[in-house]
Design a protein with these regions (language model features):
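Interdomain "pre-motor" coupling segment immediately N-terminal to P-loop NTPase/helicase cores
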Residues: 19-65
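N-terminal pre-Walker A segment at the start of P-loop NTPase domains
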Residues: 75-100
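Short glycine-rich substrate-engagement loop in P-loop NTPases that contacts/grips substrate
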Residues: 86-87, 129-168, 181
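Conserved alpha-helical scaffold flanking the Walker A/P-loop in AAA+ ATPase domains
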Residues: 95-98, 150-172, 188-196
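Walker A/P-loop nucleotide-binding motif
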Residues: 101-121
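P-loop NTPase Walker A phosphate-binding motif
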Residues: 119-131
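Loop/turn-to-beta-strand initiation segments
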Residues: 133-134, 168-171, 200-206
Length: 264
């Protein structure tokens, strides 16, 4: 105790009691010393981190993202002269997310297979997820497959639930658009999804192996919906992705590994 009869922490020397006056009567009131306050802050940070990790786990669970795409991160982005502008585009998109979200500014990444469109789109998705922003990232084939599968379990209510989850996501990444079956049903569902995002002013990132004209023809052909491509171009800035094939580079690397093993 100090000279006022108040408890003192033997560890930090800080007060464990303070003297206050209420209606003319002085009373001793417990308080946290410096080390107790530090311990409280430490436990609070641990709790906040656990809550953050739990929320992130849930966001990833409901992102519909396949496990193999979780490795698509800017930290794993191998920058070269061919793709440095795409890396810059992706990181700037994430850094300016609040403005992007406000302006409903999406991306239409188009180009030949293997040049990194999907990788870039999922890098953006993972970075935003890390920042606790709800994202759904899935291929058009995978999404339509989930809708069809839901009919077997919940009928039309399953489709409503999936469409609702898409509406709730701050960003929708729709990968490989144009690879889905060329049916009226598929085009109607794609239009419904795109139109809903457009109406709610929520951005999309769309990737396709088709040219812009090829995508337009695929979506708005004889049995298509004329407005669907207009909705996409209204929401998404078209970006041509060029460069060497990442898949070919990966294949060559694996080939070298196998050859090296065989030579031992």
């Amino acid at each position: 105790m100090n000279s006022n009869g108040l408890k003192i922490c033997p560890e930090c020397g800080g007060k464990k009691e303070v003297l206050i006056e209420i209606f003319g009567i002085k009373r001793k009131v417990p308080c946290l010393c410096r080390c107790e306050s530090a311990e409280r802050d430490r436990l609070r940070k641990i709790e906040e981190q656990e809550q953050r990790m739990h929320k992130l786990e849930n966001l990833r669970k409901y992102s519909l993202m396949g496990k193999r795409f979780r490795e698509c991160t800017f930290e794993n982005f191998e920058i070269d002269d061919k793709n440095k502008e795409m890396h810059r585009l992706g990181t700037r998109y994430c850094e300016n997310w609040q403005e992007i979200r406000k302006e409903n500014a999406g991306l239409l990444l188009y180009g030949p297979p293997g040049v990194g469109k999907t990788f870039l789109a999922f890098c953006i998705a993972n970075r935003l997820l890390d920042n606790m922003i709800p994202v759904i990232a899935i291929s058009s084939i995978g999404l339509l497959g989930k809708i069809k599968e839901s009919y077997n379990y919940w009928g039309n209510e399953g489709e409503i639930e999936i469409i609702s989850s898409l509406k709730n996501a701050s960003l929708l990444v729709l990968d490989d658009l144009g690879a889905e079956n060329n049916t009226t049903w598929a085009k109607e569902k794609i239009y419904e999804i795109i139109d809903s995002r457009c109406s709610d002013k929520k951005p999309c990132i769309i990737t396709t192996n088709l040219t812009r004209e090829g995508l337009k023809e695929k979506l708005t052909g004889d049995d298509g919906i004329a407005r669907i491509y207009d909705r996409i171009t209204e929401m998404c800035c078209p970006v041509a992705v060029a460069g060497g094939s990442r898949r070919a580079d990966i294949a060559r690397t694996k080939e070298k590994i196998i050859r090296k093993m065989m030579m031992k």
